[in-house]
Structure formats: structure tokens, C-alpha cells
């Protein structure tokens, strides 16, 4: 039964390490996501400007 306990502890530690790494990756992807959102906002502003000029009408 002791090998099972060690194996389960190993899996628990491995899962905790994986979770820590994925949280760091999510933070990095959120930052890049924010910059992507900013780019999309800029593009939508450009589209609104062309609508005001009457180019799309």
C-alpha cells in the first residue's frame, strides 16, 4: 500500500506544478490578449471613421 501512497503524492505534486505553470502561461496570454484587443479596437475606430466620411455609404 505504501507504493500507492508515494505514487499518489507524486501525482499530486506533478499536478500542482502543472497548475502553477499553466497559471503563468495564462497571465502571459492575457497580456497578449489585451494587446490584441487594443489592436481590434483601433481597427474598429478606423472603420467608424470611414463610415463617417461616407466611404462605405
Curated annotation (Swiss-Prot):
Major localisation: secreted
Recorded superkingdom: Eukaryota
Subcellular location: Secreted
UniProt entry tagged with the keyword Cytoplasm: no
Signal peptide residues on this chain, from the entry's feature table: 1-22
Comp. bias intervals (Acidic residues): 20-29, 45-57
Family: Belongs to the non-disulfide-bridged peptide (NDBP) superfamily.
Listed name of the protein: Peptide BmKa1
